[in-house]
Design a protein with these regions (language model features):
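Active-site SXXK
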Residues: 79, 89-120, 283
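Mid-domain, small-residue-enriched loop/turn segments at the edges of structured enzyme/sensor domains
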Residues: 159-218
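Acidic helix-start/capping segments at beta-turn-to-alpha-helix junctions
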Residues: 115-131, 166-167, 189-193, 238
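Conserved catalytic neighborhood of penicillin-recognizing serine enzymes
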Residues: 125-162, 168
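Structured C-terminal helix/loop/strand segments within mature extracytoplasmic catalytic/sensor domains
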Residues: 2-61, 65, 165, 216-246, ...
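Solvent-exposed coil/turn segments that connect beta secondary-structure elements
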Residues: 76-78, 86-87, 105-106, 123-125, ...
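Flexible glycine/proline-enriched surface loops and loop-helix/loop-strand junctions
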Residues: 83-85, 142-145, 152-158, 194-202, ...
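Short, conserved catalytic-motif segment at the N-terminal edge
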Residues: 66-88
């Protein structure tokens, strides 16, 4: 056999071995699992890398907040997005719309009803309950009222009674099923009577979410794909009636339509919502470990104002 034929034969053997190896690698369980995970990540509105906001000024404002911050903006008109950091953070009151969505999903499936009633006992009443603190212990409250009190008045008694009504495990199963990868419902002090070891373990957890998951939830509500068009519109309507605008809406026009949810609990200050401006957009801002609460609130106000003015083609005032 000539040298040329031997070289050609070697090349053919190398190609054959390479092809077999390539096929075996791409059919291996590990490779298939990795590929599916990548496809899953790409199909969701999830970003696991930090990116810079397009405006240096915004980055400077965020850097001066005195807190760990996550910011996510998404235009509902153009689809443009930008964000600064993204990861799981303490949810505080931002867990409320997830609980509401889980409830409405169960209602849609026929498993629960907004017309059912819950008996609110004296031991169930909590301090931060501007609505339900006025009722007589032992009163029967319709689930619809609990939902509205939770969303409109940030009523903690309403929140925890709804968690009892729906079920802690059921809510977390719903969050997992819907792809809210960073969101989990904690259950501090849910059990006020005798605690089992499992209950005690649950009581040591807190709720978490991320700007990614909040943007996904708000996008679905806006598009009517979260639960149903009718029930999504109902929940968004409650978010529009929420009067606490001290975070996202403090520096925005008072008549501006805003469907939002916010929370200010200790060192955690979070806000997220849909802003119906010249360009409709979603903005979610989450902060943690705020050393100076007033400064952090001011930072959230500034971020919201800067973005609003930018998308409305107004001059952004820079100190």
């Amino acid at each position: 056999m000539s040298i040329n034929k031997r070289i050609l034969l070697c090349l053919l053997l190398l190609l054959l071995v390479g092809g077999v190896s390539f096929h075996l690698i791409h059919q291996s369980p590990k490779y298939i699992a990795q590929k599916k995970e990548i496809e899953k990540q790409e199909s969701q509105l999830v970003h696991d890398k930090d990116t810079k906001l397009p405006y240096t000024f915004l980055n400077n404002v965020i850097a001066q907040s005195g807190a760990t911050s996550s910011v996510y903006y998404k235009s509902l008109d153009t689809g443009e997005v930008f964000y600064n950091f993204s990861g799981k953070m303490p949810a505080g009151g931002l867990i409320r719309p997830y609980v509401a969505a889980a409830l409405l999903d169960a209602v849609k499936e026929g498993n629960l009803s907004l017309d059912e009633t819950v008996t609110v006992t004296a031991t169930a009443l909590r301090k931060k309950s501007p609505a339900l603190s006025k009722i007589k212990p032992g009163s029967k409250v319709p689930v619809r009222i609990l939902l509205e009190d939770m969303m409109l008045d940030q009523d903690e008694t309403a929140l925890y009674e709804l968690v009892r009504f729906i079920g802690w495990d059921e809510i977390n199963a719903y969050l997992l099923r819907k792809g809210y990868a960073d969101t989990i419902l904690g259950s501090p002090d849910l059990v006020k009577t005798e605690e089992t070891a499992e209950d005690k373990e649950k009581s040591e957890t807190i709720s978490y979410t991320s700007v990614n998951d909040m943007v996904t939830l708000l996008t679905r509500l806006y598009e009517g794909t979260c639960v149903s068009k009718e029930l999504d519109a109902y929940l968004l309507g409650l978010m529009e009636k929420q009067n606490d605008r001290q975070l996202l809406g403090a520096l925005l026009p008072k008549k501006l339509r805003l469907a939002q949810v916010s929370t200010s609990e200790g060192r955690v200050q979070n806000a997220g919502g849909i802003i119906y401006a010249k360009e409709k957009y979603i903005l979610v801002i989450m902060t943690d470990k705020a050393l100076r609460k007033d400064e952090t609130m001011k930072t959230i106000n500034q971020i919201s104002s800067i973005i609003f003015n930018t998308v409305n083609d107004k001059e952004v005032f820079k100190k």
